[in-house]
UniProtKB/Swiss-Prot annotation:
Protein's name according to its UniProt entry: Transcriptional repressor NrdR
Function: Negatively regulates transcription of bacterial ribonucleotide reductase nrd genes and operons by binding to NrdR-boxes.
Annotated cofactor note: Binds 1 zinc ion.
Cofactor requirement: Zn(2+)
Taxonomy of the source species: Bacteria, Pseudomonadati, Pseudomonadota, Betaproteobacteria, Burkholderiales
One Pfam family per UniProt: Zn_ribbon_NrdR
Provenance organism: Burkholderia multivorans (strain ATCC 17616 / 249)
Length: 159
């Protein structure tokens, strides 16, 4: 590795350690020419696919946007931040597993809805109402009826 101080190409690794979060390897290096020390980090580079929007434009995948949209749907719902992070990680894993260079925004929205469905039904309906652009109450009723058919009946809550 090239020295950042004198640009000499011969450096030695003095120490290597796994970072605190386990996501990188930290290496202390020493330049054989100027004897200065510096630190480098080695990380896995994950190439998530570009998102193709409805209008055909392309943008980089942005984890923060997915987290923000899920947080908005889950606002004031009893779901931990760790559960949201895990859901987003599953979405990223699914995208990486496809090996595709691009993903349509519609597909990304479906992945988010699938994760929300498992986390919180209210959040799922909230997200679906915006994502699918519900026009009237009957569309809400259809989604709720879909849930009723899919899940066993629960006893009514006492107030």
């Amino acid at each position: 590795m090239r020295c950042p101080f004198c640009r000499h190409e011969d450096t030695q690794v003095v120490d290597s350690r796994v970072s605190e979060d386990g996501a990188a390897i930290r290496r202390r290096r020493r330049c054989s020419a100027c004897d200065k020390r510096f630190t480098t980090y080695e990380r896995v580079e994950l190439n998530l696919p570009a998102v193709v929007k409805k209008d055909g434009s392309r943008t980089e995948f942005d984890r923060r946007k997915i987290v923000a949209s899920m947080q908005l749907a889950l606002r004031k719902r009893p779901v931990a931040a760790d559960a949201i992070d895990a859901a987003v990680a599953r979405i990223e894993y699914q995208l990486l597993a496809t090996g595709e260079r691009e993903v349509r925004s519609e597909k990304l929205g479906e992945l988010v809805m699938n994760e929300l469905r498992g986390l919180d039904t209210i959040a799922y309906v909230r997200f679906a109402s915006v994502y699918r652009r519900f026009e009237d109450v009957s569309e809400f009723a259809d989604v709720i009826e879909e849930f009723r058919r899919a899940s066993p009946a629960k006893p009514p809550r006492k107030r």
